[in-house]
């Protein structure tokens, strides 16, 4: 018996060729009806008998090619209706919950056409199809149709329109479809904004500039990159000098996988990530014969590497025949530029020229950064290729919620029904441009999903801009402790929100429930409560933020409590004076400040903030053994310390003792400091390895004391590959179930998600 049904499909079904796929499937099966995009996903209506409908829905779910993904499918019977064929209908309006697809790297079919002299899109830098190209960064509103994207201003030529309307064509309903006759165009500008060249000549001009050591600002998918020849030491040094980025590693883009395999040691999973539709930056171990100059990632055994992911990048690198540095096109501490004129204004003193195009970018989206730990991808930055794909909540929210995230590595999130939409990485909220980007990201997500929050969730820290922004809105606000949010984000990913969990949240900073700076936390979370059961014994930040910039001050705050009030520069004698040029710089600072009466008085009188931060302990140890003099980017000292590890060198560790303090365990680091100062200070590999082993042993000790099977690991310290992998291995060996982030980063990029979860599933804090 015939019946008519409506199949409501939710998931990644817009911008992936879903409607053409459904059309072709219906044609193959001889079914009549229609399909369209809706603001919630897609709707398919067919009239057929029960078996045909069942076969159709099965094939729909099982044969949809990636990156399409059906997350929910509901079949509803309608009044019987007769159709004479199967059609694609115009999009319909309604509540906006459809998944927005991230931008996709260029597919192999488009690459073949790009370099085919007989193809009409030969060397066209904006070639795309239903399987690749811009999505999130061109979408202005839902549902996803050309008229609601920045491609609306480019009217398709006759040939493009024919492809767009031809059901069997790869560009059937490809919204960014274009060609050299009707689509976006390139131009090369000098520093004054004068057009020097256009179209292919602009590309040639950019390559010629890169070859002679110039820095070029290149407009890509989600914003501008600052690019230079990655094999030219002087060019890289010039970029660092102009961008005020003396030490932070730079990302490198390659034209093909063969070049990467020649100079790095990627495993199968890393290769899969590099070649995926998301095409993130992947951290790879160097080979000895690496052709890159050392100032790409000074002192670091790994480099952030990505493959060309747009046609423009492929064309550039094909002509350049070398890898190029591709770092975010911004000033230090600001968001990346997306507008041509804004880029000219802000990057004028960095770039020697500008390769621009006239396809507007709706919102800035940085490159994602991923590394492999314990055989799984671990995000360091979730942005292009992944955001803003929705994350299913463990249970629906009764109200529409807006989560503000933290202050560093900020992301924001909105929640409605059972879905959370986490923004792309927005950066540190330290400047007016990043505040503006933060506000625009909230406005953009709200517009896309027709979202008006009923309540706000924010970080507990009163000085955070995100906290203050929340307070200034005329809405109820719930403030959530930072490290609690870290652990909730991990728990939700693993579906253990109703279970008891030992949470270990280690990072650089977070406002504690007692008003001090936390960061080395052990949290016990049950179904109805959460409490701080252990923490690193607090130490002073001498000079507050100055201690973070100059971590020898942290070293002092560790040495004085360890060796006593009369400890001075002479106390460790030859140990501090190990003869090494760079270390002598650090030693001179240590020696000078060990005798600094003002700093000593700050410590003696307790006139400096206390912190239990594990991240700051890393800083102090790195300085103590002579690895770092001045911190110029977040995590620099910890990265330097991790780089010294030799994984198979030793299983030994330094002692850490646990003291009962006010019903909590305080982790006393003084025995560790004493033990380190008895080592040969030149053996930094040994000290770094034993230090990390000490932390793993600490986790196992407290886990065994608590006896909670599931142990969640969160916070920026768990970006450390050795620490995370060793902890996972040790926990499993000891009979525990380690939980660590998969969908979101361990750093503050996950805080907004944890905030949502704290509001949806309230727990009482036990002092």
From Swiss-Prot:
Record protein name field: Carbamoyltransferase HypF
PANTHER family from the UniProt entry: CARBAMOYLTRANSFERASE, CARBAMOYLTRANSFERASE HYPF
InterPro entries for the chain: Acylphosphatase-like_dom (IPR001792), Acylphosphatase-like_dom_sf (IPR036046), Acylphosphatase_CS (IPR017968), Carbamoyltrans_HypF-like (IPR051060), Carbamoyltransferase_HypF (IPR004421), DHBP_synth_RibB-like_a/b_dom (IPR017945), HypF_C (IPR041440), HypF_C_2 (IPR055128)
Molecular-function GO terms, alphabetical: carboxyl- or carbamoyltransferase activity; double-stranded RNA binding; ligase activity; zinc ion binding
Pfam family, one: Acylphosphatase
Keywords of the record: Ligase, Metal-binding, Zinc, Zinc-finger
Keyword check for Metal-binding: yes
Role: Involved in the maturation of [NiFe] hydrogenases. Along with HypE, it catalyzes the synthesis of the CN ligands of the active site iron of [NiFe]-hydrogenases. HypF functions as a carbamoyl transferase using carbamoylphosphate as a substrate and transferring the carboxamido moiety in an ATP-dependent reaction to the thiolate of the C-terminal cysteine of HypE yielding a protein-S-carboxamide.
First-level EC class: ligase
Pathway terms, separated by semicolons: Protein modification; [NiFe] hydrogenase maturation
Domain Acylphosphatase-like: 4-90
Catalysed reaction equations from the record: C-terminal L-cysteinyl-[HypE protein] + carbamoyl phosphate + ATP + H2O = C-terminal S-carboxamide-L-cysteinyl-[HypE protein] + AMP + phosphate + diphosphate + H(+)
Zn finger spans (C4-type): 107-132, 157-182
Record-annotated YrdC-like domain positions: 200-385
Family membership: Belongs to the carbamoyltransferase HypF family.
